[in-house]
From Swiss-Prot:
Principal cellular location given in the protein's record: endoplasmic reticulum
Keyword Membrane: yes
Protein location: Endoplasmic reticulum membrane
Protein name, UniProt field: Dolichyl-diphosphooligosaccharide--protein glycosyltransferase subunit 4
Length: 40
């Protein structure tokens, strides 16, 4: 059976990973394509 500490560590690691994935997605999406938008 999984303990409370193991569940807390797993959920924290999963949350940090998903947060960094969203940040990386937005960073990549904002900095690719649309080269004319930066000229304004």
């Amino acid at each position: 059976m999984i303990s409370d500490v193991q569940l807390a560590i797993f959920s924290n690691v999963l949350g940090v990973f998903l947060f960094l994935l969203v940040v990386a997605y937005h960073y990549i999406n904002a900095n690719t394509g649309k080269p004319s938008a930066k000229a304004k």
